Amino acid sequence: MKGKFIVFEGIDGSGKTTQINQLSKWLISSDLIPENNKLVITREPGGTKLGKSIRSLLLDTSIEKSPDSITELLLYAADRSQHINEIIRPTLDQGDWVISDRFCGSTLAYQGYGRKLDINLIKDLEAIATQGIAPDITFLLDIPIEESIRRRRNRKDDRIEKEGREFLSNVSLGFQALSEDSNWKKISAIDSKEKIISEIKSEIKKLIKNK
């Protein structure tokens, strides 16, 4: 049986890392994952050795000249293609589960809505990179822009996080639009951590029940 593919999306500061950690602990201790299978936690960009090098090119603020928007898009696609072939597809084919911090939704939100690149161009490129692999469920952890800024106040931002308020607003609007898809579940990330993980667990149980 093919494994489950779970993705977390959201603007920076939405609490994806916290909720991924909470969910992984719960799944490992539950009986939802078949006994002989495992759970793999990964991220984009940077889920593979090659991807880590691409991540550095994309996000490092010390690089003198940042990649232009199209170069940036192609680098994300290259990272995703390698990620699919090296990690995600082999893991799912073994019946194991995958949780990824970001996937295609981030590219559509950041490069499409944020950078204003052509959405259809991005979708065509994503089709090549993903080769038919799609999440079983995507959680959008939704927070207001002001809350994102407040939460990131004391941490060092990467190159994308340093973009201005207007860019972040456009990205947030992109995520809102994407979350209308039936495989997406939007969850308020300003609620308590306990309430958030409770909602996530409930959706995972529904996913298993309806498989």
UniProtKB/Swiss-Prot annotation:
Q: Which domain of life is it from?
A: Bacteria
Question: What residues does ATP bind to?
Answer: G10, I11, D12, G13, S14, G15, K16, T17
Q: Does the keyword Transferase apply?
A: yes
Q: What is its EC number?
A: 2.7.4.9
Q: Name one GO biological process term.
A: dTDP biosynthetic process
Q: Which PROSITE patterns does this one have?
A: THYMIDYLATE_KINASE
Q: What does this protein do?
A: Phosphorylation of dTMP to form dTDP in both de novo and salvage pathways of dTTP synthesis.
In terms of Pfam families, this protein maps to: Thymidylate_kin (PF02223)
Reactions catalysed, as given in the entry: dTMP + ATP = dTDP + ADP
Q: Which residues cross the membrane?
A: none
> Keyword annotations for this protein?
ATP-binding, Kinase, Nucleotide biosynthesis, Nucleotide-binding, Transferase
Quote the InterPro entries the UniProt record gives: P-loop_NTPase, Thymidylate_kin-like_dom, Thymidylate_kin_CS, Thymidylate_kinase
- A GO-annotated cellular component: cytosol
Which terms in the Gene Ontology molecular function aspect does this entry carry?
A: ATP binding; dTMP kinase activity
This protein's species is: Prochlorococcus marinus (strain NATL2A)
What is the name of the protein in this document? Thymidylate kinase
**Range of residues in the leader sequence:** none
Enzyme class label: transferase
Query: What family name appears in the similarity comment?
Result: Belongs to the thymidylate kinase family.
